[in-house]
Every structure is written in structure tokens, then in C-alpha cells.
Amino acid sequence: MTAKRPLRIVGRRRVARRADGREVRRYVPNAGLSVPVVSILDRYGEVLEDEQRAVVRWAVQGGHGANIIFAAGTTGEWNRLDNRRRQQIARVVVDECHRINAAGVAVEAWVGITGDTRAETLENLEYALDLNAEAVVVTPLSIRDSNDPVDFVNREINALFERSKRSIPVFLYDNAEISAPGHAPHLHTRDVKQMSRMDYVRGVKVTAGKAVLGNYTRAASHFNRGGDFAIYAGDPYLIFDLFAPPKGAGGWTRHYWNRYWTRDSLPYGIVAGPSNAMPREWQRALRVCRNGDAALMHRYAQVLEDFRAACEFNRGGRSFRPTLACLKAALAEMGVCRSEALAPGTPAFSDGERREFARRFRDLRRRAAATLEPGWLSEAEAERPQPRRAVKDG
């Protein structure tokens, strides 16, 4: 149970075929841990490329952390950056993932392509194709001038693929917090069903509670009849509830309710913003949850819930959680990066909160070292990965 063998659950492209004159490959979605990396900026809002690369390497943990690196998502402050910076972050992250893969560690690079407009989003999609990313993520309800998500995904994205004679797996993103003004908070499952019929739409990330997630898992059997359609939980803490083995009257009640909500279908994977700070711990937590190991689940849940508590402060009698500020502060405390700058508009620490968070995080790291299994405490990688070199015979 303490083995540190990397979990190599990676998406795979199968044998190519031709469809409407376009090259299409069969893609099996990655069932592992997706880390939506924070964007490392200087105080002027410019991307610090070397530090951004260091964050990617930290998240991968040499094969013991992220299976997927997700660039330019909500945790990466895409909605507070201009399109030039979004593309710069995508380029840096994809390139660093390619270097890591060349060094023998499997990791996928997914790129968030959502822009303020349809034109920006399509431009980002074409850019991701040129970067040779493994997949893209789009939030249809966040595009301000798109009133019909089905039309955008099924017609406009498809038209771009047909023109370029290339395609890439597309994952939908449903998050009520970033829906554009006047748009519905969540995608309708009937719309997702229509979008899933396109061969390039491979799944959806749902940042919502158990009820909304259950709407998707119950309907998933009707999605994408031609292949796999993956549903990722954007609230990673749900795994400690959904995967919990039944025990006692209360446990059995919860178990049956979970089965009702999800129609016996558990999330295919997780997209864990908090894993920026603790990637190795979240990787192991996902494994022990899937194994149904109640004792280990309790230990990991306790430590990871403690991180969420460490990010919570009281302001004027109300709870306040500057999550992105905490994630960047945690990375700085670990020596992964120096800059903790936030994009304009991202909630920041107030006086004294940064110092208090540092104290809490150091205490949490000490508890984690004493509580968790050996080898599953995140640690900095000393050097940039180097590509494997061929060994000459003789």
C-alpha cells in the first residue's frame, strides 16, 4: 500500500481513420488526476515563464502527481487575463509537458481555450492544435457572444476542424460561477447529449455539488454512443463521500443515496484545484478512494480538508476563502516559485492573513508527514527533466 510506482493512466490515441476528409483518432480519456495549474505572474501581470515551468514540474511530481496538467483554466485565472497571456501560458505549459514526457514520465497537457468571444475561443483552439496539446477544454456558457452552446460546439468548432483537416479531443466545462451575464448557470443535459454526438467531444468537467454531478452521471449512458464520455468532478472533495464504503446505518444510508444520485456511476476522474499545493497527496487520495480503503481514505481526507480549512478566514463575521492567493502562497512557501502576484480582480489576502496562512500551512505539512504514508508527501523536484538518450551497443 506504500508503493510509489507512478500511476500511468494516460489518454491514448488509437489507429487513425478518415471522416469527412479529416483525420480523426480514437481517444480514450485519462482517468487520473487533473491539476488545473495556477498562472504565475509578475506584479505587472506578465507571465513568468521559468516559474510557470517549475509549477508544472512540481504538479507532476516525477510521475507521482498529476496525470493531466490543465492550463488556462479558472484556477489559472483565464477570465482575468487577456488572450495574449492565455496563449502564452498554454504554450509554456504544453512545452514543459512535452519535455517531461520526453524524459519518460507520462503526463497530458490540456489547454483551456475559452475566450471572451467566439472569435477568441476559436483562435485559441487553433493555437492549441498548433501546440500539439492532448486536449482542450471549453466553457460554452462563459463565451459572451455565444447564445447557443450546441451551435458553437457542433457547428463552429466542427467547421474549424474541417478547414484545418485536424481535430483534437474537446472537453466541456460547466461552472455556474463563471457563466457570462444572461446565460444559464449550468449546461442542460439535453444540450450536452447533443454535443456529445460529435466525435471530438469526449467529456465534461462539472464544478458543482453532488446533485448537479448526479444529473450528468445519470444521463451519461445516453451520451456519445460512439465511444467513451468522461465526467470529471470539479469538486475533488466529493470523492471522499462518493467512494466511501458503507459502514453502519448512516454509512449505508449515504451509500444508497449516492447510488441514487449517480445511478451507480462514479466520476471518471477529478480536476483538483487544491492539488496545486499538494499534488502527490491528491494522487494517492484518488487511488485509495478507488480501492475503497476506508482507513486510508480517512487519513487523506483529514489532511486535505485541513488545507481547505487553512484557506478560510473571518472578515467582518463572515467566512472568506482567498483560494488562489493561498495556492500561490503555498507554492512560494515550498520554494516552487517566488511570485505570488494575482491577476487584477482575484481575491487577495488582507493584512495579517498571509502570515497566518504560512503558519497554518507549515503546521499542516508537519501533520501530513506524521499522518500519511511514506513517499506520499509532495516534494520539489531538483532539476528539469532531461530527455532519455539512446545507449549505443558495445
PLM segments and residue spans:
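Catalytic alpha/beta core domains of metabolic enzymes, predominantly
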Residues: 159-320
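Active-site beta->alpha loop and helix N-cap motifs at the rims of alpha/beta catalytic domains
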Residues: 2-187, 192, 344-349, 365-392
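A short, hydrophobic/aromatic-rich structural module that often spans a beta strand
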Residues: 13, 114, 131, 215-232, ...
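C-terminal alpha-helical cap/extension of soluble enzyme domains
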Residues: 4-25, 29, 34-40, 62-64, ...
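General structural feature for long, well-ordered alpha-helical segments within catalytic domains
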Residues: 47, 51-55, 85, 89, ...
